[in-house]
């Protein structure tokens, strides 16, 4: 059973070491994340990928334990492909998020140390935030990780549901860079994914070229 002390330790592990951002607008969804991986106060890796894809139109951002995140990423891909090869057919983004929430809820007493954003475009833009207990919320904009308080301040101040996908991508980039400047566990650069009805485009930005 998870006691309060352990729960706080788990939450600290999830919050420690990254900043990810998701933004939903009329044209699609933007997912963004920094590239630093930390082990305590040590920079373990400067070029980690935290924006991943289930399909060309569905992506995720990851925060938490690397091993748990790798497993959960495989689970998400299996959920999608299983539906495709059975009579059920293509699964919606909401369906994928709900299935993952069920998995996380079922293991909450021995939890996977993860926080996941799932975003993409099926018949419309969708963006979901899931924590390690299986809590799931649909969001217009959201930030996770140790730098999320800084990033969320930028999003709160500048988000507009009528902004274009390019404007949302620029906002996501600036939100993560703001966290890089103030959060020691967030760093190197930013990957920004623009997901729309025709697929996705990915951009990379760095404070300087030397990494």
From Swiss-Prot:
Q: What class of enzyme is it?
A: hydrolase
Give the species this sequence originates from: Saccharolobus islandicus (strain Y.N.15.51 / Yellowstone #2)
Q: What does this protein do?
A: Component of the proteasome core, a large protease complex with broad specificity involved in protein degradation.
Which molecular function GO terms apply here?
threonine-type endopeptidase activity
Q: Which UniProt keywords apply?
A: Autocatalytic cleavage, Cytoplasm, Hydrolase, Protease, Proteasome, Threonine protease, Zymogen
Name the chain's protein. Answer: Proteasome subunit beta 2
In the UniProt record, the gene name given for this protein reads psmB2
Per UniProt, subcellular location reads as: Cytoplasm
Active site per database record: 18 (nucleophile)
């Amino acid at each position: 059973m998870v006691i309060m002390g352990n729960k706080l330790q788990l939450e600290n592990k999830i919050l420690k070491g990254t900043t990810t951002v998701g933004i939903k607008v009329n044209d699609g969804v933007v997912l963004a994340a920094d590239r630093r991986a930390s082990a305590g106060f040590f920079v373990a890796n400067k070029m980690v990928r935290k924006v991943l894809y289930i399909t060309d139109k569905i992506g995720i951002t990851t925060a938490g334990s690397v091993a748990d995140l790798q497993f959960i990423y495989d689970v998400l891909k299996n959920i999608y492909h299983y539906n495709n090869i059975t009579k059920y057919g293509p699964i919606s983004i909401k369906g994928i998020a709900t299935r993952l929430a069920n998995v996380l809820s079922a293991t909450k007493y021995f939890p996977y140390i993860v926080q996941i954003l799932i975003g993409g475009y099926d018949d419309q833009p969708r963006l979901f935030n899931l924590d390690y207990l299986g809590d799931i919320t649909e969001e217009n904009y959201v930030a996770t990780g140790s730098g999320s308080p800084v990033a969320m301040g930028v999003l709160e101040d500048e988000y507009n549901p009528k902004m274009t996908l390019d404007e949302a991508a620029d906002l996501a980039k600036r939100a993560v860079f703001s966290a890089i400047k103030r959060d020691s566990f967030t760093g190197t650069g930013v990957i920004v994914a623009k997901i729309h009805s025709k697929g996705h485009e990915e951009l990379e930005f760095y404070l300087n070229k030397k990494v």
